[in-house]
């Protein structure tokens, strides 16, 4: 196989995506597949995935294999996946064992399969969300069994190990793994690699691979017959060899399977197996193996934690011995399995050998490290007699070893000599190692490990102690006694009071609304800017709302006090009136007289009446004249469907009905006669006789039946009658007299009977108006398919079903009647309560936001409501909506000039009225900035409501943590809106738990106002080369999606709904397949029998009940065969496995087909930005080419030549010509004619050139707009996007190709949502959001969802799956903690408003005081400890509970300032050491008595919100874990000199950290480079200086790694390596970080007692419970191991300090992130994202940022650097902002320093280059 030359590599056939969270993109509830062999190989090669510079190559080693350690990692991995609430299967292919190259791995694999798959226990993991499967398949020959398995289970992806490491080739056949991946990709769309997998909090992150463009062409290079033959030959050879060895082994050792079990049966067998075929090896190894078996059984797992130095070289003979032992054990276990299978098949249960029982599988089967330890002791001490051997291992150990040895000799009859042959031992020396050096190294390493300092630095103040009391108390015993001293270098307190983009200081009252003196100076300039901004949104706003409905607020609602005064005033007035009855009566009389006089003088009323009467007469004459001209059904219905004139001109309506009936009767008669004549004429011509030919009565009836109205016309007549009946009966309007109603009823009866053919409707009309006409039955209405009106409504008139949503009039809402659930929401807002609202898209949930806005605007001028959007597009839309709905006149309300603004916007690139607005529209990242800003006291206190739109974004792997932090940190009432929440109850409970004193209601409304119809596009291939493929849009019945499995059916999802037509179709299939008797109760006539007026007035709610009953009946069917019959009958024959095709090349024809079917306007969703743009361009080009006349092209050329010659002939005289000059006019005429030739009428829409904004016309996609085609994605210009949204809403364009940017809340109503092709980003959540854009309320009766080019299985999963559960996030990080501490420090010390200069003076004074205080330091420390103890008591009593009320917080804060001797630090720092903690008399916190009430309230809010943040993680159930993360972050900040010992924030580049917090961890890395002096000696040449800075930053920010598929391309530009000094600084920073975090992790694991969970699932299945002990060695191990433990005490780490996994693996010192991730454990959820760890040793980094600065060209970045065009603007813009932030922070610290000047210069120049290349 390896000799086959491959021209391609695996990466050429698959394309990788960026690393992202597979759970959020595929969906946590989507089942996926794990390749079991890949998992085994991954665990044995995981460290090879890390940097090649890491010394520890592997996590697990076959040479030093410990099987129990493998299963620890194996089960921990499974537990980690399960803890993310996933569903998956792990499968093994039995035949793959022969492709392993290592016998130990084969043995591990065998144990794994026996334990987890062949175990007699059912599901040993006791978890239904994971299943193990073993498949027997020679898949290279026949893939059908695996294909069936994949198709049956519909896995979303497979997790597999790519053969990218050397260790893989060492263990497994690389080429076979590659072929297996490709074969699997034939039936799976995506594979996910093990190589990059990482558990980050609630996320599982890795790289996803899809099929590349070369997949189909390259597949044969890998998967060819010749190659498969070689695989088969290799397999057969390995299989035969193994089978031969197995049979030989069985023949020679039949006694193994027949002997009765002895006391030490397991060990005897193991020893026998190991010794049997090793005669050529020294018998010493057999004896050592015997001792090893006894110790393996006797020692606890924790007592086997030896350190085996990497310098120890294992003898080749030993390796062969152990490898051979593994192989013989594999043969033995295989024989046991075969025997068990044979016994089971023969029902023979007489086998007494427990080893044959798969329940007793021993996971602790191998421990080669223990064997090497025994070997080393034997070889170094060379025992000469039994006493010496006993002194090494203990007498009891040797006795047991001899017993096993002798039993083997006796029981099995093998002559293996004597055990105590000490001549062999004494001559057994190690010639590869200096064993004394090895022992010394082991002792040194053990001593070093046991002396690891696990102490921590508890940086504390009142804030820290109060927000994390539990963790603080638990960490106290581990607190370091000696905090490091350092030289003073930092003497300035950090105050984050400036904007990230400007050095301008933020005023303390920035968020208070006051009219400042500077307002008058800057008002005009500022107003002009704001007017310009508002003006740009005017057209956008008008497309969202009718500008005539704008609400102008000129006054505020009265306050409670004002209402009370008004009530008292009214009571006084009423009491005065009661004493003046006479005057009151005379007044009443006078009023009556006046009224009479007034009424008699209203002359205009009669004139209006005459005018109305005149118009009515004109209308009557016009309609009467039109009646005579009516020649079609459409013309009759146009008048009859309009009931506006019914009360005024009922006779005219009756005339129209009569004419309509007569018209149809005559039309039918004429058609019958014409058809008769035609038939008779044909027969005459065919007949040769002249006899008279007549039609039979049957033939005449057939002709009459064939000429009945079509179903479309019948539906129109039915809906017309339905409208009249509802007006006359259900609406109970007394608009017509009874006589007139009877006249109308007679016409209705005739139409229902003769035209529509519904007997029950005719009988209803007859009975209701007592017409006394004959009762009809089905035979009286002709040969009709439908004979009752109920089925007719369901099947042919579902659009007119009553949509009764419980709407009622409510004075609080303008312009519409709110539904019942919306009224409940109004009440919640009026009470200032919170709510979680989950309602389907287009149901109208956003209305509550506008009610909230209106209430706040009317209530006061100071209150703020914040609207949080997930995207900037939604921010723009909401801003425009507010502008279009409201206007508030603050000057009229205040009676003076005002600084207030109604609405503001805050995004990273657009800021407007943030400080002065009442409605703030923002994104979550910017709201967090406001929450954490030290200047936001007034802002938070003014917040009345916060509205979180699309709150399911909390599940996002990108910014989900920010959403969660905002929800937890928010102190105000809130509304959380979403249409797609899976675990709704869990999420609601989480929101309630945040603040138990805050009521959070749940509003769950599942119904859609407009239902969705599902379709799929079917391609019919071309018949020959001359023809083209055709496309049909076929309806997709929801029940067809149940056919997900090849051999079965899936269950019905709760979200699967049937609309009316689908419900009646299902009933008819059930009746046909099962018989009417079984389903008669589901007969619509019977089911709806008790519904009043059912013949014309069914409601949508009735259908929902009916479809639920149908689904329940189907679910309860006992027979799978019956279910399959039903599903098959409801499935279109075209809905098969051939739905995937090359749709992109046919996109124009597809769009035209939708236009033909009247399915436009439509949103075409594709989740690739570049593809969206290309599709829009392609359709535009095709349409332009098709609609352009070739003759016009020639005419254009001729006209261009004429114009050019004409202009040349005029020459310079042209400029002097008058406008009315004939020559000038002729030239203008020619130009106008030329311009007219360029105009093409839009194919999709109706827009003019003026509809396209001037700013947009230069956009590359602008020409496509002229044909009604657009693209919409995050890479587009914002002006273009805004224009597209406006044009689409206005129906001026009808085709938009979009990513999910239009799926999240943007108002883009469409008739259809079209999914183009598959994508890993297309999951259930995304599909529901995208589909919800179709059929918006008030626009369409139905929404259409069309699937194009998606596999059937994917469509099934999207339509018949429940929404994924929200998992949650890790919410704490060092950057966040620094912001929290900075804000607290400013709130408690900001009342003095000290500037930085004042702080510097204060610190210098403190330094002078320090010398005087040194003598008193010890006494103060004692005093401090005493007070801290008092604090601890208080914490125990008060702080443990999460739900503290506001009063408790206030008392607690006030008390703390009285009792705690808070001190300010005299900070002393160096590069890598924390601040000194010497104290002075100067207080660090100001007494609350000295603070303002606003500052006190701010402190209370901050503490309460931070407590909530640390105690209410949606993902982490245990709040202590979050508190540990918080205190670790504080410790880290102290060690890195961002905080002092008393938790005072220091200005040590802290501004860069906080303002670049969203780029964590690289904000900290950059600061470490600054402090390390990387930029101290910059090149003097400006260009070289700029290149150096950008080179360094390109490794940290906006990094684009180069996938392996591109590395081979010479056109890719790779960044040069970082300088060694940079590497060293980063490494030192990483080492300090990991050391600190390891300590906290160690303490937390100690708290969890995690050694009990060494095997998360199988702890109780270990052979010896003693092996899981958590106490000390002397207390747990038996006496037989005392000697061993005594001799080896110096050679193994203390079991007290480390858990079992650490002891066995030898990972004691965490040197890299990969190691850290492997020791986290399955019961800890620490995300490594919270660590400011920077790894720059990974894959090559794209140099596009540096390249752009060098050549300033976009094209090379796209073509050479392979940066997507749609991403380029975003990346370069982001990098420009980063440069600006850094330059601002450095300039603020020291504007004249060379570093500040260098960064300011490069930032300015980079931004200029960016602006020159990008217009937007």
UniProtKB/Swiss-Prot annotation:
Residue ranges of the motif DEAH box: 949-952
Q: Please name one Pfam family that this protein belongs to.
A: Helicase_C
Q: What class of enzyme is it?
A: hydrolase
Location, primary (coarse class): nucleus
Recorded hits in CDD domains, A to Z, give: DEXHc_DDX60
The EC number on file is 3.6.4.-
Where does the record place Acidic residues bias? Answer: 1445-1454
- Tell me which residues make up the Helicase C-terminal domain: 1198-1379
> What spans are recorded as compositionally biased (Basic and acidic residues)?
562-577, 1395-1427
Give the molecular function GO annotations.
ATP binding; helicase activity; hydrolase activity; nucleic acid binding
Keyword flag Glycosyltransferase:
no
InterPro entries reported for this sequence: DEAD/DEAH_box_helicase_dom, Helicase_ATP-bd, Helicase_C-like, P-loop_NTPase, SKI2_subfamily_helicases
Q: Does the keyword Flavoprotein apply?
A: no
Q: Helicase ATP-binding domain: from which residue to which, for each copy?
A: 826-999
**Residue numbers spanned by region Disordered:** 338-357, 562-605, 1388-1487
Please tell me where ATP binds in this chain: 839-846
Q: Fetch the PROSITE patterns from UniProt.
A: HELICASE_ATP_BIND_1, HELICASE_CTER
Q: Where in the cell is it found?
A: Nucleus
Q: Where is the composition biased (Low complexity)?
A: 339-357, 581-603, 1456-1487
Keyword annotations from UniProtKB, A to Z? ATP-binding, Helicase, Hydrolase, Nucleotide-binding, Nucleus
Regarding protein family, the annotation reads: Belongs to the helicase family. SKI2 subfamily.
Name this polypeptide is given? Uncharacterized helicase DDB_G0278827
Q: Which organism is it from?
A: Dictyostelium discoideum
